[in-house]
Amino acid sequence: MLSYITWFFILIGFVTVTSYLVPVLLAAFKWGEQDLKAKYNAKWALVSGSSSGIGRAVAKKLAKQGLNVVLVALDDDALKGTYESLKKEFPNQQFRAVGCNLGKSDHEYDYMPIIKEATKDIDVQILVNNAGYIQLSAFFRSTLQKQLTNLECNMMSHVKITHHFLSNMVEKGLKGCITFTSSQSAFFPAPSCSSYGGGKAFLASFAASLAIECYTYGIDVLCLMSGPIQTNFYDNQPKLSFFKFFHAISDTPDSAADIMLNGVGRITWRDSSLFTIFSRLVVKIVDMNLLVQGIARGQSLSSDFKNHPELR
């Protein structure tokens, strides 16, 4: 006969796993596509990191719904190409290309005045904070400035952009939504990209708290926990063997964009892939202290750890 203590732990395990899996199953089998233009009576969206990958896919899907889109990304050929391509594909929609460096903010350069000037005559109600990049190396082997630049792009730019447009929405009584592109590394140890993982963890926590603050104003907040995606995300990084594994299990940008847009207003944290869901279940079952110690002791067995001294 099972003791009360045994039943107690069974109940804890059941509630822990079930409360996570129910939204996952609803998202997979019940929740369908949403028309965000109609849902929020919106005209304009802004997507950062919109020149490629998930950002470009989201911008295209929003334009397909009839929304005008502000494209924010580095001022390069990729942004120009995306801008021209979307204008050609959606001639009835308006697009604005805003080229700026979201990783740089100091007394000499500030991207916020550029974004504010480009959007001063419109109401942005769909805000997609997607810009980000990874930098692979042991934390101490990279310069402090490189780490701060990574955090500025992946974390602080989202805070600054969100503060501006959220304030406008609340002041004018507009409904809308705000999304953040986070990562599996937000809740799972990410050695060799600790600033990246730390920044993504901030976004997840920030989004959860912000969702509660925004609820009474009719503004939905979602944080996408992305897994490996078939993009140029890992270009210009060390050629690591686990990238081959990531490529084999990676999702398409279109799939991640669908998952993001379908989850808005229905859930706050949305895991975008089987890899992310599996990782989430691991940290629900295995305590973080044990997980960290296990990874720390086992990393020396990895060929990447042995062959790439910059990672250790």
Where are these regions (language model features)?
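Conserved glycine-rich Rossmann-like NAD(P)H-binding loop of the short-chain dehydrogenase/reductase
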Residues: Q65-T82
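Residue(s) in the substrate-gating loop at a strand-loop-helix junction
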Residues: S183
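SDR active-site lid
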Residues: S205, A211-V283, M288-L291, I295
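Active-site helix of classical SDR
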Residues: T162, G199
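Rossmann-fold cofactor-recognition segment
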Residues: K88-D106
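Conserved glycine-rich cofactor-binding loop
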Residues: W44, S51-S52, D75
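Conserved mid-core segment of classical short-chain dehydrogenase/reductases
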Residues: D106-E117, I126, G132-L148, S192
